Curated annotation (Swiss-Prot):
Keywords: Hydrolase, Magnesium
A matching Pfam family: S6PP
Gene3D superfamilies, A to Z: 3.10.450.50, 3.90.1070.10, HAD superfamily/HAD-like
Enzyme class: hydrolase
Protein name (database record): Probable sucrose-phosphatase 1
Stated family: Belongs to the sucrose phosphatase family.
Pathway stated in the Swiss-Prot or TrEMBL entry: Glycan biosynthesis; sucrose biosynthesis; sucrose from D-fructose 6-phosphate and UDP-alpha-D-glucose: step 2/2
Catalysed reaction, written as an equation: sucrose 6(F)-phosphate + H2O = sucrose + phosphate
Length: 423
């Protein structure tokens, strides 16, 4: 949260499975479309929050499988854990707050009396969360009995049933909604209340998010019956909550446009040739650069000299690129080499995307842009920590020039093949 000097233009708080991440989309197109939009338009003045029922272990596994962005804040284990930044620094104040009227040992003892409850894997058992699988037919009766037993034991707990099988027992003060309320209060106390907040979900454990006063909300088109039922009973007619017509991350993009929260056209949906912008945004320039690079290698743009010429127009004739090995090459020579790799990834599950994009102004018309540049093909992943120097030049065809690129392998994601890191 410290990255912003003032109020966030927009906070997006999204569930992951079947909301931000579409497990039926093998190409991850909607997730990549959202990622390109966020890094292009919002990453410098807004906050991205992932709110998931997953434990830290399963959350990290998902990040290795899908082309997800690095969020500013991560809420995990159904709102019982809050962490900040890439390092996932825990919020100790939140953990201390959840200890009120909570005794995990008593919860375990009481739930052991119900044969209908099957413990979830050990990774999903957390300090402030005990999780089970339970058959849909038995769920409501078990919840009613459990609630009474916990009250008799002097505990104040919350029981959440979602996904038609998952039953989570948490402290009463926990949950996705309370975690978000805590964060919004924290931002307000620092004098940084967000201009707008958009919450996004698909299942029962997301319902609390939509109850926070003042937020906009989107139930993605594939939302489950339990969330739609909650909406019908509690929020029908609320103009700030919509049921999207698009699935998952595409539904989130739809909501940004519907509520007029900001630009809602992803760079991945912009055709080539690009229209010259009146005001150059370094973030937008970088994202579009690598989207076009991917489309060229996948043969999703025509094999035209105009594409190669565009890359030359936006790179300085004397500019250099330093590859991860330390090899220094001419930017224009690297662009020329693109001609030979047109369509080499056609029909393959090849994608490239940028993450953790950070911009600093180095002069009146010059910028230093730092980001993680990811490339994936099937299950194989590569990542370069990339620095790019960019000058705004209104008189040039594109309005800007890239003068220098420096790439270093991210530990654990390197390749011996320097060709894997052409631009």
């Amino acid at each position: 949260m410290d990255k912003l000097s003032g109020s966030a233009r927009l906070i997006i708080v999204s569930d992951l499975d079947h909301t931000m991440v579409d497990h039926h989309d093998e190409e991850n197109l909607s997730l990549l479309r959202f990622g390109a939009l966020w890094e292009s338009v919002y990453c410098q003045d807004s906050l991205l929050v992932f709110s998931t029922g997953r434990s830290p272990t399963l959350y990290k596994e998902l990040r290795k499988e899908k082309p997800m962005l690095t969020p500013d804040i991560t809420i995990m284990s159904v709102g019982t854990e809050i962490t900040y930044g890439e390092a996932m620094v825990p919020d100790d104040g939140w953990e201390e707050y959840l200890n009120n009227k909570w005794d995990r040992n008593v919860v375990v003892e009481e739930t052991a009396k119900f044969s209908e409850l099957k413990l979830q894997p050990e990774t999903e058992q957390r300090p402030h969360k005990v999780s089970f699988f339970v058959d849909k037919k038995s769920a409501q009766e078990v919840i009613k009995s459990l609630s009474g037993n916990m009250e008799k034991c002097g505990l104040d707990v919350k029981i959440i049933y979602s996904g038609g099988q998952d039953l989570d027992i948490l402290p009463q003060g926990a949950g996705k909604g309370q975690a978000l309320a805590y964060l919004l209060k924290k931002l307000s106390s620092c004098g940084k209340p967000p201009n707008n907040t958009l919450v996004c979900g698909d299942s029962g454990n997301d319902a609390e998010l939509f109850s926070i006063p003042g937020v906009h909300g989107v139930m993605v088109s594939n939302a489950q019956e339990e969330l739609l039922q909650w909406y019908a009973e509690n929020a029908k007619g609320n103009p700030k909550i919509i049921h999207a017509t698009e699935r998952c991350a595409a539904g989130i993009i739809e909501a940004i446009g519907h509520f007029k929260l900001g630009p809602s056209v992803s760079p991945r949906d912009v055709g080539f040739p690009y229209v010259k912008e009146d005001h150059i945004k370094p973030t937008d320039a970088v994202v579009k650069f690598y989207v076009l690079y991917e489309k060229w290698r996948r043969a999703e743009v025509p094999k035209s000299d105009s594409v190669v010429q565009y890359f030359k127009n936006i790179t300085h004739a004397n500019g250099v690129i330093i590859q991860p090995s330390g090899l220094e090459c001419s930017l224009h020579a690297s662009v020329d080499a693109l001609s030979s790799c047109y369509g080499e990834k056609q029909g393959k599950k090849y994608r490239t995307w940028v993450d953790r994009l950070f911009v600093s102004q180095s002069g009146s018309d010059s910028w230093l842009v730092r980001f993680d540049l990811w490339e994936a093909e099937g299950d194989a992943r590569l990542c370069c920590l990339t620095s790019l120097a960019l000058n705004v030049k209104p008189e040039t065809p594109a309005g800007f020039l890239i003068t220098h690129v420096h790439k270093t392998w991210l530990k654990g994601y390197s390749s011996a093949d320097e060709q894997s890191s052409k631009l």
